[in-house]
Amino acid sequence: MNKLLFIAFVLFFAVDAHAQDWANIKRYEDDNSKVPAPAKGEKRVVYMGDSITDFWIKSDSEFFAGKPYYNRGISGQTTGQMLVRFREDVISLKPKVVVILAGINDVAQNNGPSKLEDVFGNIASMAELARANHIKVVISSILPANAFPWRPAINPVAGIKAINDMLKAYAAKNGFTYLDYFTAMANDKSGLSPNLAKDGVHPTLEGYRIMEPMVEKAIAEALVSRN
């Protein structure tokens, strides 16, 4: 087999594999099978998200250590992909709380252009699936970003603000806990400063250290909420 044919062969099967598991349900399939039933009184939390969640446990493993926290972030994912895998990666684990942090990759058009209302709708659908399964919900704002290194032609500021406004209003109307990372972390250009995210999108350890007490406060609020 010549070199060009071999490359084409590899690319074909890589694309075919992605098409067969668009939502990457296989990523956590084995891990999920090993998760035990919740212990009595356990306040299990699943973190559902994209690379910002995925990289969190790698950047600050101590935050997750010894806690009933399950990280189910997958780098690059859009809200549609998360919605497809929500049952396997959240509901099946029987948490008390799910923390949803999503939307930045939709704004970046990782899977092509998306209507902002559809991005919001995917997050709302995850929240409603959780509620139907007696799981408390924390809806996180999209983090600040004023540019994407991998999509330099896109200015994300207006899209992020619009989705965050929809999420905040939706959470208030439906009794979900809203976690406003944006206000706490945005600089005067509606982005993340280099100390919080070297590439302007993915938090540094310092960035995650700002997020950690905020998310734990939100989880505590969700646990005592009526919804």
Predicted regions and their residues:
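Catalytic His-Asp segment of secreted/periplasmic serine-dependent ester chemistry enzymes
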Residues: 9, 20, 143-227
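Active-site segments of SGNH/GDSL-like serine hydrolases
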Residues: 101-107, 127-160
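Charged, glycine-enriched surface loops/patches
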Residues: 116-140, 166-176
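Structural recognition of the beta-strand scaffold that forms the well-ordered cores
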Residues: 44-49, 69-73, 97-102, 137-141, ...
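Serine-esterase "nucleophile elbow" of acetyl-processing enzymes
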Residues: 18-97
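Glycine-rich anion/phosphate-binding loops
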Residues: 77-84, 114-122
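Sec-dependent N-terminal signal peptides
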Residues: 4-13
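Cell-envelope and extracellular/periplasmic
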Residues: 72-75, 102-103, 111, 186
